[in-house]
């Protein structure tokens, strides 16, 4: 049985051991890096946003893994399938990105070489993203500002899980796949408008004390279908998800909890359709990739290999009240991330 946490708790007990594993509908788990026993080179802290309009998708990530890290910017044209990106490797970045302990305390301003990124948390759970990146691939420049707005009382999926037989390792992840987005991005020498009701955003926050090897699959999406805003977050990896899986579906900001979800990927061609099913037959979903982004980061004893795919989701979900919801053409992302220390 999964364990729902319904009030604020610490992830440590009185003597510093990990406790209170489970899942929550909000940021109830208190994380403090200063209390960790884990060596700094095994701690990962990251902040990630994916925003998209009917024509373009942009993904921004700040990633600090102790011995190495990166700043990643990816711009995808959903119409002609073109991609432009910037991947800035960071050696020993611990603390440089100044990522906060809590997801609701996000005020981050990062300037690396010629790029400037700002993530700002505002009142009512909204977010502001400011970007100025003049040297993306294909001589493209990306600059602009967008505001991510939330619905009143919108819920998030937050999971806190250990690794089996590794008492000091854990995975704490939050995903909010329901933002509406407004603003302008200047890309390919033309303005791209993000209009409320036609543009969306996904926020992911992660704090992880890693084992030596890990592999993690993830997918998330958001959009409007037949007058309802829907979104989801599904994923799994080598962490012990007995107390709470990452899998949840959202309708107008309300969370509907799922148990296990399986990713079915063609081993010969990852650009073929992906299929998703849940163990209790509540979810059946297909993903159609339109573009692929991959990168590898290696330094001394640590490596990170990531494969991302952007595209559209189709399927059906049985909600918590037993009603059946069909959805089509919802924009999102899938990913496989593998780490090795």
What function would you assign to each model-found segment?
Residues 1-341:
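Structured soluble/peripheral alpha/beta segments that form catalytic or ligand/cofactor-binding pockets
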């Amino acid at each position: 049985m999964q364990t729902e946490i319904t009030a604020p708790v610490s992830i440590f007990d009185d003597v510093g051991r990990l406790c209170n594993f489970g899942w929550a509908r909000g940021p109830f788990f208190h994380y403090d890096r200063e209390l960790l026993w884990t060596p700094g080179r095994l701690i990962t802290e990251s902040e990630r946003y994916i925003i998209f309009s009917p024509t373009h998708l942009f993904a921004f990530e700040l990633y600090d893994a102790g011995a190495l890290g990166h700043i990643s910017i990816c711009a995808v044209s959903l119409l002609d399938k073109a991609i432009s990106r910037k991947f800035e490797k960071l050696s020993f970045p611990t603390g440089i990105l100044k990522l906060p302990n809590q997801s609701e305390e996000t005020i981050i301003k990062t300037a690396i070489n010629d790029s400037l990124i700002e993530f700002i948390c505002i009142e009512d759970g909204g977010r502001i993203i400011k970007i100025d990146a003049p040297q993306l691939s294909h001589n493209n420049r990306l600059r602009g500002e967008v505001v991510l707005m939330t619905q009143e009382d919108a819920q998030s999926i937050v999971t806190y899980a250990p690794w089996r037989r590794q008492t000091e390792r854990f995975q704490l992840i939050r995903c909010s796949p329901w933002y509406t987005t407004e603003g302008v991005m200047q890309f390919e020498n033309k303005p791209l408008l993000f209009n409320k009701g036609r543009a969306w955003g996904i926020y992911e926050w992660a704090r992880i004390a890693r084992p030596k090897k890990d592999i993690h699959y993830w997918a998330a999406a958001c959009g409007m279908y037949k007058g309802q805003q829907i979104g989801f977050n599904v994923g799994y990896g080598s962490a012990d998800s007995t107390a709470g899986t990452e899998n949840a579906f959202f309708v107008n900001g309300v969370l509907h909890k799922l148990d296990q979800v399986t990713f079915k990927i063609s081993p010969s061609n990852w650009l073929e359709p992906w299929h998703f099913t849940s163990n209790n037959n509540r979810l059946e979903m297909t993903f159609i990739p339109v573009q692929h982004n991959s990168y590898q980061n290696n330094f001394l004893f640590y490596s990170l290999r990531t494969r991302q795919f952007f595209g559209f989701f189709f399927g059906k979900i049985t909600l918590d009240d037993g009603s059946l919801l069909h959805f089509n053409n919802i924009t999102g992302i899938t990913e496989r991330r593998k780490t090795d220390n």
